[in-house]
Amino acid sequence: MRIRPLVALAVLIVLSACQSPRATAVHPAAQAPIPKPPPTLATAILRAAHLGPADWTTTVFLSFGLTARNQDQFAALLGSGRTVSPAEYAARFGPDPLLVQDAVSAVNAVGLKATWQPPSSVIAADGPAPAAASLLHVDIESYRLPDGTTFYATLEQPHLPPPLSAVTSNVSGLDDYRGARGYAVRPGGLWPVDVLSFYDIKPLRDAGLDGTGQTIMLPEIDDLPNLNDLDKFAAKFGLPAFGPLLTLKRDPNWGTPEKPQGETVLDLEIAHSVAPNAKLVVYFSAPDFGHGDRALDQLVTDHLGSIISESLGSCEPDTPSGARNVYASIQDRAIALGLSHFVASGDSGAYTCGLDQAPAGSFPSTLPTVTAVGGTSVFESQQGIYYKEYAWGSPIDQSGGGGGVSHFYAAPAYQKNELQAPSHGQRQVPDVAADSDPSTGFHIIFGGQDGQAGGTSAATPLWAATVALINQDLKQKGLREVGFANPALYWMGENSAKLNPAPFHDVVAGNNLYFNAAAGWDSATGWGSMDAAAMDAAWIRYIKGGGA
């Protein structure tokens, strides 16, 4: 299963400004079509030539998600908002090491090479496709698309034999189908000073909050061969050099990332603009769940920071249950350890799987244990200050902020008061939003060029970096860090009338090609974008007892 970067960088031609009586879109422009979602796996198989069973020269990269012990206690912990140390997690909820070693031995016995190191949530296993097919009782087939791309896949549900089934019930990596996307950029975009002003981040920065002592961790699938673009960006905007703050993590077991496409640069430049002294740690992997799960698992195990910014996703209904469940088991551990995890909700509006498919969300943003970040279009007044936002939705190029109803996950307790008619009691996304429209996007430097980028992958590091500033303030005041953000965010949204000023810019106009923005929470923009200074004050109140 492929994972897609959710960045929208498009070649644009700047036109004359089109003004309403009071406001203009930031840098209005006409744009070339944004790349559409790749076909679902089932559609790709129908279009592809069947090459027969994957043979012994085809290597598969499997990740088995380990089941936490004491499930009732673990569920109570996640629901309480409390956190545990890595050592306490291993002692109370981690898998039984002896049972895991039995499972590793069983996998090795069929001709795969399996490894596990505590406190990992994953058994990694590589080897010939026929060996994996035999172990899991599935047929793994090879295919070739019309463009010559080859991939392996199975549409069958795996059956895990004992002793594997004693410690895991899920596996990812049974296909390597992926849809890579290419991008270009155009001049313009919001400068860092605009972002600080529009989202009321400037008062936090003026108070000395710059991310010092915070670390943002980023799973990425497109490479960063050098720091040239980052160095130019920092120099242009008077920001600290990236070098002392940036760590790049690679491992052969995580596969090879794709060539640079702008996603990694976008994430890092936006995060650095908001929290310029926060450390940044990138975990590179190949763009499939088998490899990506391993990198994410190591990210959680390393626990180098308390914030994750993830701008990746796939069509939720098309994501195999094994891949979803392995990822979810890793994310459960992240929540228990107190990590905040922001995930882009997608750039195809309510149609993450394509306009020829039913509305659907983007996984993993649909997980109830992450904060899903949707998209807006920003408008400024004629005086150049923040005026309003609309839900991002462009029928011309069929793009917009991801949002809608999960097919698989029930609505969590924190969202019970926001359930809307189409939900049928299911999780709804996004939770929050920020500027994502490429026509009103962010100034970046990529490939040596000044350019403008959008997508919910731009809004996601903006949220992550803002929380880094809030965490810094909380720690200075002797309070706990944000951790899993959603209970607090929903408390703020539901009590916004009592919080003055309000912590959100409530977006009440526009749509994401299906769902309309409205007062309060909605499936186009969640609670809206942040007023960072007001949100910092609200978070302090929440943790001190106003809602915690």
Language-model segments: which ranges?
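C-terminal motif of bacterial Sec signal peptides marking the signal peptidase cleavage site
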Residues: V14-A17
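A short beta-strand-to-loop transition that corresponds to the Sensor-1 phosphate-sensing loop
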Residues: T376
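Bacterial signal peptide processing site
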Residues: Q19-P21
